Regions:
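Metal-dependent phosphohydrolase cores
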Residues: 2-220
């Protein structure tokens, strides 16, 4: 004979299933900086951003995934200084606000790295969202508007592409025609300037020169 469960037994609720913690719930969204700051990448605060951290990070992030010739990586810090040189060569005097905008145009890469264009296209939405939020916060920290005027963005982009052409052909193994299709042809630089800015510096040199140029525009 089959024994039926009693009414008391039937009325008892089943025990709850164990709650599984997802990877997202466990993920850490902040980066500890050498300054002691803790920067939340998803909700960054201007109070947690220091130029010393930016300079240190950018001087150690490689352009072109590190696929460049020379004794050192060609760092994002050195690239930034080359962009600033290209802008001055293009328009002459660079005022304080434009100079700051140029010096900070790749600043988010001190925490998210310099992702190469082909891979960036694969995860564009996620990467761009974090990058734009970080850049807006960095701008606020150093007295710039979160979103730059379109004219300023276009000028920086033109100087950035000119710098990329030189890096591609002098350091990254591109031939001129190949680079021309991607970046356009830049204005010529004096040989002494090109020789200096396209010879990869050590991380310490890149960090020092980046800070010197930044303080020229920021004034502190």
């Amino acid at each position: 004979m089959v024994r039926r469960p009693s009414k008391a037994t039937r009325s008892q609720p089943a025990p709850p299933a164990p709650r599984l913690r997802t990877h997202a719930a466990q993920a850490r969204a902040w980066q500890r900086m050498l300054s002691g700051r803790r920067l939340d990448l998803l909700d960054p605060s201007p109070l947690d951003i220091e130029i010393a951290d930016i300079a240190h990070g950018l001087a150690r992030v490689a352009r072109w995934n590190g696929q460049t010739s020379g004794a050192h990586i060609f760092s994002v810090a050195q690239h930034t200084l080359l962009v600033e040189v290209m802008a001055r060569h293009r328009i002459g005097d660079v005022d304080r606000r434009l100079g700051l905008a140029i010096m900070l145009h790749d600043a988010p890469e001190y925490v998210i790295g310099d992702m190469i264009t082909p891979f960036k296209a694969v995860i564009a939405d996620s990467y761009k969202t974090v990058e734009k939020r970080l850049l807006a916060t960095i701008h606020i920290r150093f007295g710039l508007p979160p979103k730059l005027p379109e004219s300023v963005e276009k000028l920086i982009k033109a100087a950035d592409r000119a710098a990329a052409f030189l890096e591609a052909t002098r350091l990254a193994g591109f031939d001129a025609d190949e680079a021309l299709g991607f970046f356009g042809r830049p204005p010529a630089l004096p040989p002494t300037i090109e020789g200096d800015y396209l010879t990869p510096w050590s991380a310490d040199t890149a960090e020092t020169r980046y800070l010197e140029r930044f303080h020229k525009y920021h004034g502190d």
